């Protein structure tokens, strides 16, 4: 972890809850007001996060914090957070390391990002849960071939694997709707963290 524990928690909360209020951030991060303000000022001055203030007269009534995905610093930091999430996922699901390694080795290079979503992403899976995988592509790919590769790669995995294949453009168009909102909120990026950050950049 490249940040102090309290700062990392603040970053994670802002990334997963864009627009989070200062009071909620302090409560969920379990830090003092002084610590939170110190960490936030550092992250703001580094252009890693951004804020919006609501004023009442000359007083600041509400402070909302967002990941700053328009800055290089923000992109790099939040892609590292995605990488950390992936490492934590594989520490808890060692039986998926091999299948994903084989899958990534053999899939079309037109696939820019691979994400886990659903119960496995929230660590709420049971023995009956499907492993939901989203593939985002930028150019035409052979979807049937991809599904066969998924079957081959996960042949030793004892649970159902449910691949979902989307074009990057379609994902962007629907990013604020239904299942897409859920995927944005809870996911593990297996491939293409920086590409994914760039995808959602215009929605920060």
Task: Show the residue positions of the predicted features.
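Catalytic core of pol beta-like nucleotidyltransferases
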Residues: 1-110, 122-128, 138-204
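Short helix-loop-helix/strand-helix junction enriched in hydrophobic and basic residues
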Residues: 112-120
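Acidic Asp/Glu-based divalent-cation binding sites
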Residues: 130-132
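Short hydrophobic/aromatic beta-strand micro-patches
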Residues: 134-136
